[in-house]
């Protein structure tokens, strides 16, 4: 008699949330894990995946990705191909993410943070708190999980930045911060400002490694140790870091012919290039700057000559990358612990998605091979803790009753072989066959998403690590 939709047979399961590690079979029915036992009869399943010799992990949860604009919707497939089953889009807007999901969804779960942009979603860098509140209210009603401050790229004043963090906490939503303001940019000073701006409010500090490039103290390692010390003193803040050697920023130019993004400006000047068309083209031709091009199925880096030609073709309206992320900084942020033995930076992320650096498995398992992390710690930082951050208690583990989100991994080659989301195979052998997806939202977004027939689930942020992390406000202010 057939009982289960799918059986993952013979794999080596690593599930630190439930203290399970060893050879187990996993039975899936109706989008849920229903049995985890040493041996389950293959005859009970409609479909069997033989995982002998491979690892079976809870689906990866990436707490920092980018999936917009819709022309970069290939990011949905890129995530599924990398073993990711849930991701936090850190820009939005939610309507554009939904457009991309409809065009090229891969069956994964997506939460969205709508970004605060001076001259865009906000009137200016000095927007008053009431205006920020109004934008947050609209964003949540549209289905967003919260907001993203992008002060490193497009800074707000310190006053508006503080107001936004406070308003998000008052609304009980999620908030993340690419550190920087009109006071200090995307560097260690901007990072330290962000910690002060947050006060006792709750906040996700994005890509901690990105503020430690030697711009303020000359030594990336010294800056990283200082950043980790200050972050460890504020356990109420959640954080993530990534391991990609390249950053990502816009090459778009403003009316004065200067890059919109302050990060792009800094990278150009740090490399000895001018902050204009000439500098962008020269940096590309020299191989210092790599130009990204989005195709329907992928986003790729172009060779120098091709990249320069593409910049001209699209009038610099694309994304570019610079080799500014130090390996020492990536290592320290991924592995550093506090005196109690917990990780200072909660999660490993990629800042990937539609940016070609979805390195959770490839680089994360390299840390395992290096004995810098155990496999269980890797799973903790890429699935268990991220699920807790986002208030998704049925994800990040594979206990019976949990959502059937998992990945089968070739640990020797550091690659995913099978990605399963909500009990459906969405990637096998590198081929993505998943479609659509599910939006992770708050109670405020349910009506709008229901009216649009968008599949969704509500995160329990109040019980998640974002609001339960020790040391901050004891409850949401709203």
Listing of model-derived features with the role each one plays in the protein:
Residues 59-65, 87-89, 110-114, 147-149, ...:
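Hydrophobic faces of well-ordered beta-strands that scaffold small-molecule active sites
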């Amino acid at each position: 008699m057939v009982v289960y939709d799918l059986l993952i047979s013979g794999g080596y399961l690593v599930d630190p949330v439930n203290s399970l590690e060893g050879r187990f079979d996993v039975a899936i029915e109706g989008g849920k894990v229903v049995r985890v036992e040493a041996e389950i009869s293959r005859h009970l399943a409609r479909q069997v995946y033989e995982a002998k010799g491979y690892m079976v992990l809870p689906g990866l949860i990436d707490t920092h990705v980018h999936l917009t604009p819709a022309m970069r919707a290939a990011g949905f497939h890129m995530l599924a191909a990398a073993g990711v089953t849930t991701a936090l889009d850190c820009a939005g807007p939610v309507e554009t993410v939904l457009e991309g999901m409809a065009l090229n969804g891969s069956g994964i779960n997506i939460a969205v943070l709508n970004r605060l942009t001076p001259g865009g979603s906000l009137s200016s860098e000095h927007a008053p708190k009431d205006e920020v509140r109004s934008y947050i209210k609209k964003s949540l009603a549209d289905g967003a999980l919260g907001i993203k401050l992008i002060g490193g790229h497009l800074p707000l004043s310190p006053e508006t930045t503080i107001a936004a963090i406070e308003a998000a906490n008052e609304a009980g939503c999620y908030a993340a911060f690419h550190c920087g303001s009109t006071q200090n940019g995307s560097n260690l000073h901007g990072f330290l400002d962000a910690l002060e701006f947050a006060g006792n409010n709750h906040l996700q500090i994005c890509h901690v490694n990105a503020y430690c490039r030697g711009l303020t103290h000359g030594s990336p390692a010294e800056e990283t140790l200082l950043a980790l010390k200050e972050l460890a003193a504020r356990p109420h803040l959640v954080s993530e870091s990534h391991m990609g050697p390249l950053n990502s920023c816009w090459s778009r130019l403003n009316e004065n012919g200067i890059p919109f993004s302050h990060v792009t400006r800094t990278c150009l000047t740090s490399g000895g290039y001018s902050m204009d068309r000439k500098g962008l083209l020269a940096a590309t031709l020299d191989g210092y700057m790599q130009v990204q091009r989005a195709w329907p199925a992928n986003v790729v880096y172009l060779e120098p000559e091709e990249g320069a030609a593409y910049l001209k073709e699209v009038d610099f309206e694309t994304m570019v990358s610079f080799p500014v992320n130090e390996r020492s900084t990536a290592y320290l942020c991924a592995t550093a612990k506090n005196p109690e033995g917990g990780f200072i930076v909660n999660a490993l992320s990629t800042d990937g998605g539609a940016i070609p650096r979805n390195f959770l498995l490839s680089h994360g398992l390299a840390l395992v091979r290096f004995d810098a992390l155990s496999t269980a710690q890797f799973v903790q930082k890429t699935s268990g803790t991220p699920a807790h951050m986002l208030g998704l208690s049925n994800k990040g583990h594979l206990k019976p009753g949990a959502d059937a989100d998992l990945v089968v991994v070739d640990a020797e080659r550091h690659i995913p072989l099978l990605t399963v989301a909500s009990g459906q195979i969405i990637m096998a052998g590198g081929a993505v066959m998943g479609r659509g997806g599910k939006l992770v939202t708050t109670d405020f977004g349910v009506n709008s998403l229901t009216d649009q027939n968008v599949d969704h689930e509500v995160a329990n942020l109040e019980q998640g690590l974002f609001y339960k992390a020790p040391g901050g406000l004891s409850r949401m202010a709203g």
